[in-house]
Design a protein with these regions (language model features):
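Short, basic-rich loop-to-helix N-cap that marks the start of a DNA-contacting helix
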Residues: 61-63
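Alpha-helical bundle regulatory/interaction domains
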Residues: 1-46, 53-54, 58, 70-148
Length: 148
């Protein structure tokens, strides 16, 4: 039975949603594109191309954004060091974590932690999450409101 291109595209989208859901659920686990692709019965190249087409970013970029969002929440709590947060969200390298955090948020994690601990007291978590959501593509420095 041959498959139409539209039917194949719908199957790929369903697999991509499962990959995205796995990243959302298991962001703190060691994940790589090869493992995600195996789980979706796709090649790594096909997964990366289709994921980017569907969601506008690579699977790795999406994973790092999820990790940084979670790191921001942990840093706002103020009870963990930057290193502890780095490992809690699944990053193996403090340098990579700090670089990516700074790219997305517009300030280093230590600065964010210091400002957030004092700047969002009494702010509901759901509001803090929206206000402090990472911004992509070097836009953070130009548009990020200060928390303090």
């Amino acid at each position: 039975m041959s498959s139409t291109p539209e039917a194949q595209r719908l199957r790929d989208l369903a697999r991509l949603r499962r990959v995205r859901d796995r990243i959302d659920r298991d962001y703190a686990q060691p994940l790589d594109v090869e493992a995600l692709a195996r789980g979706a019965n796709m090649s790594a190249g096909h997964l990366s191309r289709e994921f980017r087409r569907a969601y506008g970013e690579s699977p790795y970029s999406y994973l790092m954004t999820r990790r940084i969002e979670r790191a921001m929440a942990l840093l706002r709590r103020g009870d963990l060091s930057v290193t502890e947060v780095c490992f809690a969200v699944g990053c193996a390298s403090l340098g990579t974590f700090s670089t990516r955090f700074t790219e997305l948020v517009g300030m280093p994690p230590s600065t964010y932690r210091a400002q957030a601990v004092h700047g969002d007291a009494g702010l509901p978590a759901c509001v803090a999450k929206q206000v402090t959501r990472p911004i992509r593509n070097q836009e953070a420095a130009a548009t990020r409101p200060q928390l303090a």
